Regions:
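Conserved active-site and cofactor/substrate-binding residues in soluble primary-metabolism enzymes
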Residues: 17, 126, 150-157, 205-213, ...
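Short glycine-rich or small-residue beta-strand-to-loop segments that form or flank ligand, phosphate
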Residues: 8-11, 146, 244-246, 303-306
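N-terminal Rossmann-like NAD(P) cofactor-binding subdomain of oxidoreductases
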Residues: 1-198, 203-205, 223, 295-297, ...
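C-terminal active-site/capping subdomain that shapes the small-molecule cofactor and substrate pocket
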Residues: 246-341
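Short beta-strand or tight-loop elements
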Residues: 127, 226, 288-290
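Predominant activation on well-ordered alpha-helical scaffold segments within soluble catalytic domains
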Residues: 23, 156-163, 211-215, 259, ...
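C-terminal substrate-binding/catalytic lobe of Rossmann-fold NAD(P)-dependent dehydrogenases
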Residues: 206-274
Length: 341
């Protein structure tokens, strides 16, 4: 139910790329009052001084205290929010975490992929995966919400409709490409301009850590274990994800049947567009939209998905989940494009 007063929101980690996008979306949200922005490196400065073009004039606070916020959007490095979330929940806030800390239900898998013991494993089963198209009803009563990664978002949109319908084999191959902002705002040698410009390379070929959450969600969709071959690539553009999934239809399944399945799936969301030709990332830049194309080649289904890694693959998905959780219009705060960086 929509609250009579505006929802009070705090963004923790507000000066990283995802945090900046969350802040921008909430600042323009008709049902939300942005009450705190927090970030260690720029603490004490006005937000508008730190983030180009921002109209938010709050002073950036140090620490991790959301104050009296009704909802906390945490955009912190992996392994940080896991220890802080219990305190935020105890203060009565709904927590929307943009890191990987609550995406997995298996604490052992978390340690394998993120290198540390999960400090609050008892919360893993409480967290709801914030992909509205898959978990809309569960999100309506969730207190701990975990925003999917950008690669998983695109991969799941490409594979889940067919797996749910039982029309493909449980063995999928996904080739995905990401812009540089997916690596975060902190400078590093591997994402510097001279290193990535005019060059494309694969990485994580032996296993990308986002694969673990993909496998959990794919298993839920298929009702059985799914074999996933996933290879990500870094490409020299600022933002965007393009994922191409190669799916093997079961005997008798036609291209038209598969397209109808994806059309029905897309019809359940205001943010999914089934398009007539393979999409370009530029068409969804700065938005919470996903463009999905279903193709067919020599008996293999080829499903291509384009999203913005900071939008549908990050902050946009977080705000979409917020809207569902608090009974707001699902498009609230998501009508305009956020184009920095």
């Amino acid at each position: 139910m929509v609250q009579a007063t505006r929802l009070r929101a705090a963004v923790i980690g507000s000066t990283g790329y995802i945090g900046m996008a969350c802040t921008a979306l909430l600042a323009g949200h008709p049902d939300v009052e942005l009450t705190r922005v927090l970030g260690h490196s720029s603490a004490g400065k006005r937000y508008s001084e730190v983030v180009p073009g921002s109209a938010v004039d709050l002073v950036i606070e140090d620490g991790n205290d959301p104050g009296s916020a009704d909802v906390v959007l945490a955009a912190l490095p992996h392994t940080v929010a896991a220890a802080l979330a219990p305190g935020w929940l105890a203060q009565g806030a709904t927590v929307i975490d943009c890191s990987a800390d609550f995406r997995l239900h298996d604490a052992a898998a978390y340690k394998t992929w993120y290198g540390v013991d999960h400090p609050t494993p008892d919360l893993l089963d409480e967290a709801i995966y914030a992909m509205v198209e898959l978990h809309r009803e569960s999100l309506k009563s969730a207190n701990l919400i975990s925003v999917p990664g950008c690669y998983p978002t695109a991969t799941l949109l490409a594979c889940v409709p067919a797996l749910r319908a039982g029309v493909i084999e449980a063995d999928v191959v996904v080739d995905a490409k990401s812009g540089i902002s997916g690596a975060g705002r902190s400078p590093s040698l591997g994402t510097g301009f001279s290193e990535v410009n005019e060059s494309v390379h694969a990485y994580g070929v032996e296993g990308h850590r986002h694969k673990s959450e993909m496998l959990e969600q794919l298993r839920d969709a298929a009702g059985t274990d799914v074999r996933l071959t996933f290879v990500p690539h870094l490409i020299p553009m600022t933002r965007g994800i393009l994922a191409t999934a190669y799916l093997r239809p079961r005997a008798g399944v036609t291209a038209e049947q598969l397209r109808e399945i994806y059309a029905s799936f897309c019809a359940t969301s205001l943010f999914l567009d089934l398009v007539a030709r393979p999409p370009a990332t530029k068409t969804v830049t700065g938005t919470n939209r996903a463009a999905i194309h279903v193709g067919w080649q020599d008996g293999v289904a080829v499903v291509t998905v384009a999203i913005d890694n900071l939008g549908k693959g990050g902050a946009g998905q977080a705000v979409h989940a917020l809207n569902v959780r608090f009974g707001f219009d699902e498009t609230a705060g998501l009508e305009s494009r956020v184009l920095w960086p």
